[in-house]
């Protein structure tokens, strides 16, 4: 993974097949791949041979087996240290259909997220309530639990997909917010030790 004091560059994928083939995207200089859900196995299979760390969360349209055999580590409600950063995640979205595996009531999402401690980089399929969501579209309302998590834990970066914000919020308080649809290259924050002056 290179120098632990330098920022990592991530290829982040969410919601739809990138318009550039994954094999070509992986030729770019990246340190890891982050998946934010609603991507089919067919969309992800090119990652199987990539010798990079791969972390992800599932989206509201996923079945929960899309990462199998591809080497993507599911970080839903988990914390994982990588390259000097702590990553965590939350799968799914606001419950708008009862038959979806990765949908939550606002109350259930809040309860689950209270168990997740501080992370530097938070991966989520859904945005937080009131940030890059759509209050007029029941399927694209953000999760109150994610908003509470941002207020409580203040991660350095929050990455999400799921919605279609016309002008995405890029910062909320101390947290950099990145909306992803298709693919996006993101420079992650420097590890905490290298963010403090010597």
Segments (PLM) and residue ranges:
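N-terminal active-site segment of His-dependent metallophosphoesterases
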Residues: 1-49, 114-118
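Divalent metal-coordination and catalytic microenvironments
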Residues: 15, 33, 38, 59, ...
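Conserved catalytic scaffold of divalent metal-dependent phosphoesterases
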Residues: 15-20, 55-145
């Amino acid at each position: 993974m290179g120098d632990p004091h330098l920022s990592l560059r991530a290829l982040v994928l969410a919601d739809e097949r990138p318009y550039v083939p994954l094999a070509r995207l992986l030729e770019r200089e990246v340190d890891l791949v982050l998946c934010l859900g609603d991507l089919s196995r067919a969309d992800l299979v090119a990652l199987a041979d990539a010798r990079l760390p791969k972390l992800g969360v599932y989206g509201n349209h996923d079945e929960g087996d899309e990462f199998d055999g591809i080497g993507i580590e599911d970080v839903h409600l988990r914390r994982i240290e990588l390259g000097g950063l702590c990553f965590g995640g939350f799968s799914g979205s606001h419950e708008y259909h009862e038959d979806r595996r990765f949908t939550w009531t606002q109350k259930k999402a809040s309860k689950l997220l209270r168990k997740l401690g501080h992370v530097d980089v938070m991966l989520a399929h859904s945005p937080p309530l009131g940030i890059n969501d759509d209050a007029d579209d029941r399927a694209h309302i953000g999760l109150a639990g994610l908003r509470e998590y941002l207020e409580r834990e203040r991660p350095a970066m929050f990455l999400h997909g799921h919605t279609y914000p016309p002008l995405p919020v890029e910062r909320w308080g101390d947290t950099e917010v990145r909306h992803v649809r298709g693919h996006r290259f993101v420079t992650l924050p420097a590890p905490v030790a290298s963010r403090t002056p010597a």
